[in-house]
């Protein structure tokens, strides 16, 4: 079987020319100019890995650096190593054999529970991995009652998602919505939320922006707090940096001033 070549951009050129060409057939009005919405408030909460996580993370980080530097290794295999580092930050690791190793006393889950005790109102909790979504939902159901939490992710049917949204929006007993931003981050109205917590992020800026705006749209009367759980000096900081670079590039392409974000 033949391999597939993937070209990776290292820098961008002629952005001014691209901007001028876009202006000839496009007109853009931002949400800020059309709607009078309360502000978004961004916060970070540092999460420190436990000893087992640290040891495995450092071992796999050294391995990942060697693999990424090796030009003979496929791009897909390099991505697997990055994915594993991200999994460790989020409390689990999928091995080569497909087995799931779950770290005891997940520090991120503990920090999430602390945040939920501090904040008022309803909360959306976005997580990238199915394991985290199911674990968070189970934990919150045990602590606050099964009717306090609903989920939206790939395993849920369209009808179940509609029921979850309706319960979150209108049922006072339902305080938490846990979901994957790629599944629940588009088109839904979740303005009952006053807090949006990112248990984890991906490199996809569109998914991030769209998932933020499920709570911050017409009908929202309160300030919305966005809280990111981040492991310092880890792959998660690289993901945040990549998202910020994409925001700046987008603004530059559209001829706008990049707003402070995150």
What spans do the regions from the language model cover?
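Inter-lobe coupling linker of SF2 helicases/translocases
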Residues: 1-101, 105-121, 243-248
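Short glycine-/polar-rich loops that comprise or flank the Walker A/P-loop
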Residues: 40-42, 145-148, 191-195, 220-226
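Short beta-strand segments
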Residues: 46-47, 86, 123-130, 149-154, ...
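Conserved nucleotide-binding/hydrolysis micro-motifs of P-loop NTPases
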Residues: 51-54, 130-132, 157, 183-185, ...
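Conserved helicase ATPase core of P-loop NTP-dependent helicases/translocases
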Residues: 124-126, 134-137, 141-184
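SF2 helicase motor core recognition
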Residues: 133-137, 162, 175-200, 204-223
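A conserved SF2-helicase RecA2
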Residues: 203-262
């Amino acid at each position: 079987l033949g391999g597939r070549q993937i070209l990776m951009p290292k820098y961008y050129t002629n952005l001014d020319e691209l901007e001028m060409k876009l202006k000839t057939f496009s007109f853009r009005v931002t949400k800020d100019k059309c709607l009078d919405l309360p502000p978004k408030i961004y916060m970070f909460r540092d999460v420190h890995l436990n000893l087992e996580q640290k040891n495995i993370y450092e071992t796999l980080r050294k391995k990942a650096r060697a693999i990424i530097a090796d030009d003979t290794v496929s791009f897909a295999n390099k991505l697997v190593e990055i994915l594993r580092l991200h999994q460790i930050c989020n409390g689990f690791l999928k091995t080569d054999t497909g087995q799931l190793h779950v770290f005891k006393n997940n520090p991120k889950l503990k920090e999430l529970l602390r945040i939920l005790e501090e904040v008022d109102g309803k909360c959306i909790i976005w997580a990238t991995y199915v394991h985290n979504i199911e674990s968070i939902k189970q934990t919150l159901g045990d602590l606050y009652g099964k009717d306090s939490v609903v989920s939206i992710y790939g395993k849920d049917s369209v009808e179940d998602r509609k029921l979850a949204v309706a319960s979150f929006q209108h049922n006072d007993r339902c305080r938490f919505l846990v979901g994957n931003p790629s599944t629940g981050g588009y088109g839904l109205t979740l303005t009952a939320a006053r807090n949006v917590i990112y248990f984890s992020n991906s490199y996809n800026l569109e998914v991030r922006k769209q998932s933020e705006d499920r709570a911050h749209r017409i009908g929202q009367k309160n300030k919305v707090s966005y809280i990111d759980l981040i492991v310092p000096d880890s792959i998660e900081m690289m993901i945040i940096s990549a998202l910020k670079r994409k925001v700046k590039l987008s603004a530059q392409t559209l001829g706008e001033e990049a707003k402070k974000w995150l």
